[in-house]
Amino acid sequence: MDSFNKVFGALLALSIGLAGQACFAQAMPATAGETLSGKHIVLADVVHGHEAILVAGFSHEGGMKAGEWIKRIHADPALAGVTVYEVAMLEAAPSFVRGMIKSGMRKGMSPEQQDDFVVLTQDEKAWETCFGVGDDKEPYVMLIDAGGKVIWRGHGAASDLEPQLRAAAHQES
């Protein structure tokens, strides 16, 4: 029985690892969005050719927690050369409310910060798959290499996961 448990555990770990690799190889959705400054943008296009970090919120609560990630990434000298975009998914919000939501997001943000904050209103399921969303109340983070390949993903508190992001970015450099 003990050897069965070892073999079963090894097979389970292998299958989880292979499933994870399939997710990392997946292409980013080519969804058109808009920055808070009003510029039309396709994230898959603008991040291609250089390393980038995407920090996404898929709910109000997740979006509020994403701000802590942005602060920590910008304060970390090891991540200084990496382009960072904050992403808010508003597909579920009624269209007549989206303008008010975006107005609230803009408050207290400089024009430069607004240029790096992307609002998406379609393809939510594709983005949830890309980020590996399980709990939309968490912020989700992806590190993407210059070829557009996802090399690290995480979700949760920045204080817990930022060292992993930094290590992944350092390995990629």
Regions found by a protein language model. Name each.
Residues Y85-V87, M100-D136:
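Short, internal strand/loop/helix patches
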